[in-house]
Amino acid sequence: MPKNILIFDSGIGGLSVFKDIRYQIPLAKYIYAFDNAGFPYGELTEDILIERTSYIIQKLCHRHKIDIVVIACNTASTVVLPTLRTLLSIPVVGVVPAIKPAALVSQKIGLLATPATIKRSYTFDLIKSFASISDVKLLGSTRLVEMAEEKMVGIPVNLIELDEILKSWKGQVDCIVLGCTHFPFLRKEIKEILGRNVLLIDSGEAIARRVKQLLGSVDANKGDHLFGEVYCSASTKNEEALNKTFKELDFNPLQTLGYPKSLDR
Protein backbone atom coordinates (compact mmCIF):
# COMPACT_ATOMS: atom_id res chain seq x y z
CA MET A 1 0.00 0.00 0.00
CA PRO A 2 1.21 3.54 -0.72
CA LYS A 3 1.95 5.90 2.14
CA ASN A 4 -0.66 8.53 3.02
CA ILE A 5 0.89 11.98 3.47
CA LEU A 6 -1.18 14.81 4.98
CA ILE A 7 -0.03 18.33 4.12
CA PHE A 8 -1.67 21.20 6.01
CA ASP A 9 -1.59 24.97 5.62
CA SER A 10 -3.81 27.97 6.25
CA GLY A 11 -4.17 28.42 2.49
CA ILE A 12 -2.82 27.00 -0.74
CA GLY A 13 0.74 28.20 -0.21
CA GLY A 14 1.59 24.76 1.16
CA LEU A 15 1.36 23.47 -2.40
CA SER A 16 4.93 24.73 -2.82
CA VAL A 17 5.97 22.17 -0.19
CA PHE A 18 3.71 19.52 -1.73
CA LYS A 19 5.52 19.90 -5.06
CA ASP A 20 8.92 19.39 -3.43
CA ILE A 21 7.72 16.33 -1.51
CA ARG A 22 6.00 14.77 -4.51
CA TYR A 23 9.16 15.24 -6.57
CA GLN A 24 11.04 13.05 -4.09
CA ILE A 25 8.13 10.71 -3.23
CA PRO A 26 5.98 10.40 -6.38
CA LEU A 27 4.32 7.10 -5.41
CA ALA A 28 2.37 8.28 -2.38
CA LYS A 29 -1.23 9.24 -1.65
CA TYR A 30 -1.47 12.95 -0.83
CA ILE A 31 -4.13 14.59 1.29
CA TYR A 32 -3.93 18.38 1.26
CA ALA A 33 -5.95 20.43 3.75
CA PHE A 34 -6.16 24.17 4.22
CA ASP A 35 -7.96 26.22 6.85
CA ASN A 36 -9.36 28.98 4.66
CA ALA A 37 -11.83 29.95 7.40
CA GLY A 38 -8.86 30.85 9.60
CA PHE A 39 -6.74 32.45 6.87
CA PRO A 40 -4.38 34.25 7.33
CA TYR A 41 -2.75 32.46 10.26
CA GLY A 42 -0.32 35.30 10.87
CA GLU A 43 -3.14 37.26 12.51
CA LEU A 44 -4.43 34.57 14.90
CA THR A 45 -3.53 34.09 18.56
CA GLU A 46 -1.45 31.06 19.50
CA ASP A 47 -4.36 29.44 21.38
CA ILE A 48 -6.66 29.68 18.36
CA LEU A 49 -3.92 28.37 16.07
CA ILE A 50 -3.41 25.31 18.26
CA GLU A 51 -7.14 24.68 18.60
CA ARG A 52 -7.90 24.92 14.89
CA THR A 53 -4.95 22.92 13.59
CA SER A 54 -5.41 20.19 16.21
CA TYR A 55 -9.08 19.74 15.37
CA ILE A 56 -8.67 19.65 11.59
CA ILE A 57 -5.61 17.41 11.55
CA GLN A 58 -7.04 14.91 14.05
CA LYS A 59 -10.27 14.73 12.03
CA LEU A 60 -8.36 13.94 8.84
CA CYS A 61 -6.12 11.42 10.57
CA HIS A 62 -9.27 9.56 11.63
CA ARG A 63 -10.77 9.78 8.14
CA HIS A 64 -7.62 8.63 6.32
CA LYS A 65 -4.90 6.29 7.54
CA ILE A 66 -2.28 9.02 7.64
CA ASP A 67 1.37 7.95 7.89
CA ILE A 68 2.93 11.39 8.35
CA VAL A 69 1.74 14.97 8.84
CA VAL A 70 3.49 17.96 7.30
CA ILE A 71 2.63 21.40 8.68
CA ALA A 72 3.40 23.42 5.55
CA CYS A 73 3.01 26.74 7.31
CA ASN A 74 5.85 28.59 9.02
CA THR A 75 3.53 30.52 11.32
CA ALA A 76 1.76 27.38 12.56
CA SER A 77 4.99 25.38 12.80
CA THR A 78 6.45 27.81 15.33
CA VAL A 79 3.44 27.19 17.60
CA VAL A 80 1.60 23.90 17.12
CA LEU A 81 4.24 21.18 16.70
CA PRO A 82 4.62 20.24 20.40
CA THR A 83 0.84 19.87 20.81
CA LEU A 84 0.40 17.81 17.64
CA ARG A 85 3.30 15.52 18.51
CA THR A 86 1.62 14.84 21.85
CA LEU A 87 -1.78 14.16 20.27
CA LEU A 88 -0.60 11.97 17.38
CA SER A 89 1.38 8.73 17.27
CA ILE A 90 2.74 9.41 13.77
CA PRO A 91 5.58 11.74 12.73
CA VAL A 92 4.77 15.45 12.45
CA VAL A 93 7.12 17.60 10.38
CA GLY A 94 7.09 21.39 10.40
CA VAL A 95 8.76 24.06 8.32
CA VAL A 96 11.17 26.65 9.65
CA PRO A 97 12.78 29.62 7.91
CA ALA A 98 15.93 28.56 6.03
CA ILE A 99 18.22 30.85 8.03
CA LYS A 100 21.05 28.31 8.31
CA PRO A 101 21.59 27.71 4.57
CA ALA A 102 21.21 31.43 3.88
CA ALA A 103 23.96 32.26 6.37
CA LEU A 104 26.32 29.89 4.55
CA VAL A 105 26.13 31.95 1.36
CA SER A 106 25.47 35.52 2.50
CA GLN A 107 25.89 38.05 5.28
CA LYS A 108 23.23 40.40 3.89
CA ILE A 109 20.09 38.37 4.50
CA GLY A 110 16.45 39.34 4.38
CA LEU A 111 13.84 37.20 6.13
CA LEU A 112 10.48 37.58 4.42
CA ALA A 113 7.68 36.08 6.51
CA THR A 114 4.36 36.80 8.19
CA PRO A 115 4.16 39.43 10.94
CA ALA A 116 3.71 36.63 13.48
CA THR A 117 6.77 34.65 12.37
CA ILE A 118 9.17 37.58 12.54
CA LYS A 119 8.05 38.33 16.12
CA ARG A 120 8.41 34.82 17.54
CA SER A 121 11.31 34.01 19.84
CA TYR A 122 11.88 30.87 17.76
CA THR A 123 12.87 33.03 14.80
CA PHE A 124 15.29 35.11 16.85
CA ASP A 125 16.83 31.92 18.24
CA LEU A 126 17.41 30.66 14.68
CA ILE A 127 19.14 33.90 13.75
CA LYS A 128 21.25 33.87 16.91
CA SER A 129 22.27 30.23 16.37
CA PHE A 130 23.02 30.27 12.65
CA ALA A 131 23.41 33.87 11.47
CA SER A 132 24.82 35.78 14.42
CA ILE A 133 27.53 37.46 12.31
CA SER A 134 25.17 38.28 9.46
CA ASP A 135 23.06 41.37 8.94
CA VAL A 136 19.54 39.91 8.95
CA LYS A 137 16.71 42.24 8.04
CA LEU A 138 13.14 41.22 8.92
CA LEU A 139 10.00 42.01 6.95
CA GLY A 140 6.58 40.69 7.88
CA SER A 141 3.70 41.05 5.44
CA THR A 142 0.21 39.58 5.45
CA ARG A 143 -0.51 41.23 2.11
CA LEU A 144 2.18 39.13 0.39
CA VAL A 145 0.41 35.99 1.59
CA GLU A 146 -2.84 37.27 0.11
CA MET A 147 -1.11 38.17 -3.16
CA ALA A 148 0.24 34.63 -3.49
CA GLU A 149 -3.24 33.20 -2.87
CA GLU A 150 -4.69 35.55 -5.48
CA LYS A 151 -2.06 34.56 -8.04
CA MET A 152 -2.95 30.89 -7.57
CA VAL A 153 -6.53 31.58 -8.64
CA GLY A 154 -5.55 33.65 -11.66
CA ILE A 155 -5.34 37.22 -10.30
CA PRO A 156 -2.16 38.97 -11.56
CA VAL A 157 0.32 40.28 -8.99
CA ASN A 158 0.28 44.07 -8.70
CA LEU A 159 3.97 44.93 -9.15
CA ILE A 160 3.47 48.52 -7.98
CA GLU A 161 2.04 47.27 -4.70
CA LEU A 162 4.78 44.64 -4.39
CA ASP A 163 7.43 47.30 -5.00
CA GLU A 164 5.95 49.39 -2.18
CA ILE A 165 6.24 46.42 0.20
CA LEU A 166 9.82 45.50 -0.74
CA LYS A 167 11.38 48.87 -1.61
CA SER A 168 13.28 49.24 1.69
CA TRP A 169 15.32 46.15 0.77
CA LYS A 170 16.56 47.40 -2.60
CA GLY A 171 20.35 47.19 -2.58
CA GLN A 172 20.30 46.11 1.08
CA VAL A 173 20.06 42.31 0.80
CA ASP A 174 21.51 39.76 -1.62
CA CYS A 175 19.82 36.67 -0.17
CA ILE A 176 16.18 36.38 0.85
CA VAL A 177 14.77 33.62 3.02
CA LEU A 178 11.20 32.92 1.94
CA GLY A 179 9.87 32.33 5.45
CA CYS A 180 6.31 31.54 4.38
CA THR A 181 5.30 28.65 2.14
CA HIS A 182 3.18 31.02 0.04
CA PHE A 183 6.17 33.06 -1.06
CA PRO A 184 7.83 30.62 -3.51
CA PHE A 185 4.85 31.33 -5.77
CA LEU A 186 6.03 34.97 -5.92
CA ARG A 187 9.64 34.20 -6.89
CA LYS A 188 9.38 35.71 -10.36
CA GLU A 189 7.76 38.93 -9.13
CA ILE A 190 10.15 39.35 -6.18
CA LYS A 191 13.12 39.09 -8.53
CA GLU A 192 11.52 41.64 -10.85
CA ILE A 193 11.45 44.10 -7.97
CA LEU A 194 14.74 43.33 -6.20
CA GLY A 195 16.87 42.12 -9.10
CA ARG A 196 17.72 38.86 -10.81
CA ASN A 197 20.92 38.40 -8.79
CA VAL A 198 19.12 38.21 -5.45
CA LEU A 199 19.18 34.62 -4.18
CA LEU A 200 15.85 33.27 -2.91
CA ILE A 201 15.93 30.33 -0.48
CA ASP A 202 13.05 28.30 0.96
CA SER A 203 12.70 25.16 3.09
CA GLY A 204 10.75 22.97 0.66
CA GLU A 205 13.53 20.68 -0.53
CA ALA A 206 14.86 20.12 3.00
CA ILE A 207 11.37 19.28 4.27
CA ALA A 208 10.92 16.79 1.43
CA ARG A 209 14.18 15.05 2.33
CA ARG A 210 13.08 14.82 5.96
CA VAL A 211 9.69 13.36 5.05
CA LYS A 212 11.35 10.77 2.80
CA GLN A 213 13.76 9.84 5.58
CA LEU A 214 10.97 9.38 8.13
CA LEU A 215 8.73 7.37 5.80
CA GLY A 216 11.41 4.96 4.65
CA SER A 217 10.57 2.77 1.67
CA VAL A 218 7.31 3.56 -0.12
CA ASP A 219 5.50 0.39 -1.21
CA ALA A 220 3.56 1.23 -4.37
CA ASN A 221 3.47 0.08 -7.96
CA LYS A 222 5.05 2.42 -10.48
CA GLY A 223 2.03 1.95 -12.71
CA ASP A 224 -0.36 3.22 -10.03
CA HIS A 225 -1.76 6.72 -10.58
CA LEU A 226 -2.94 8.04 -7.25
CA PHE A 227 -5.26 11.02 -7.17
CA GLY A 228 -4.98 13.14 -4.04
CA GLU A 229 -7.74 14.45 -1.80
CA VAL A 230 -8.08 18.11 -0.90
CA TYR A 231 -10.09 19.66 1.92
CA CYS A 232 -10.91 23.20 2.98
CA SER A 233 -12.42 24.20 6.32
CA ALA A 234 -15.23 26.32 4.82
CA SER A 235 -16.89 26.87 1.47
CA THR A 236 -15.11 29.31 -0.83
CA LYS A 237 -16.17 31.56 -3.70
CA ASN A 238 -12.98 30.53 -5.52
CA GLU A 239 -13.92 26.86 -5.70
CA GLU A 240 -13.95 26.67 -9.50
CA ALA A 241 -10.52 28.30 -9.87
CA LEU A 242 -9.10 26.22 -7.02
CA ASN A 243 -10.40 23.00 -8.53
CA LYS A 244 -8.61 23.87 -11.76
CA THR A 245 -5.36 24.38 -9.84
CA PHE A 246 -5.75 21.16 -7.87
CA LYS A 247 -6.77 19.13 -10.93
CA GLU A 248 -3.50 20.10 -12.63
CA LEU A 249 -1.73 18.61 -9.59
CA ASP A 250 -3.74 15.35 -9.75
CA PHE A 251 -6.14 16.06 -6.90
CA ASN A 252 -9.82 15.17 -6.84
CA PRO A 253 -12.36 18.03 -6.51
CA LEU A 254 -12.30 20.17 -3.38
CA GLN A 255 -14.22 18.90 -0.35
CA THR A 256 -15.42 21.03 2.57
CA LEU A 257 -14.34 19.59 5.89
CA GLY A 258 -16.27 22.01 8.07
CA TYR A 259 -15.21 23.54 11.34
CA PRO A 260 -17.82 23.68 14.14
CA LYS A 261 -16.68 26.86 15.86
CA SER A 262 -16.86 30.41 14.56
CA LEU A 263 -13.57 32.25 14.27
CA ASP A 264 -13.17 34.90 16.95
CA ARG A 265 -10.17 36.99 16.02
UniProtKB/Swiss-Prot annotation:
Where in the sequence is the active site?
A: 73, 180
Recall the GO molecular function terms of this protein's record: glutamate racemase activity
Q: What class of enzyme is it?
A: isomerase
Q: Which residues bind substrate?
A: 9-10, 41-42, 74-75, 181-182
Q: Name one GO biological process term.
A: cell wall organization
Q: Which reaction does it catalyse?
A: L-glutamate = D-glutamate
This protein's pathway: Cell wall biogenesis; peptidoglycan biosynthesis
UniProt-listed Enzyme Commission number(s): 5.1.1.3
InterPro entries, sorted? Asp/Glu/hydantoin_racemase, Asp/Glu_race, Asp/Glu_racemase_AS_1, Asp/Glu_racemase_AS_2, Glu_race
PROSITE patterns named among the record's database cross-references? ASP_GLU_RACEMASE_1 (PS00923), ASP_GLU_RACEMASE_2 (PS00924)
Q: Which UniProt keywords apply?
A: Cell shape, Cell wall biogenesis/degradation, Isomerase, Peptidoglycan synthesis
The UniProt function text for this chain reads: Provides the (R)-glutamate required for cell wall biosynthesis.
Read off the HAMAP family from this record.
Answer: Glu_racemase (MF_00258)
Q: Which family does it belong to?
A: Belongs to the aspartate/glutamate racemases family.
Protein name per Swiss-Prot or TrEMBL: Glutamate racemase
Q: Which organism is it from?
A: Aliivibrio salmonicida (strain LFI1238)
Q: Output the lineage of the source organism.
A: Bacteria, Pseudomonadati, Pseudomonadota, Gammaproteobacteria, Vibrionales
- What gene is this protein a product of? murI
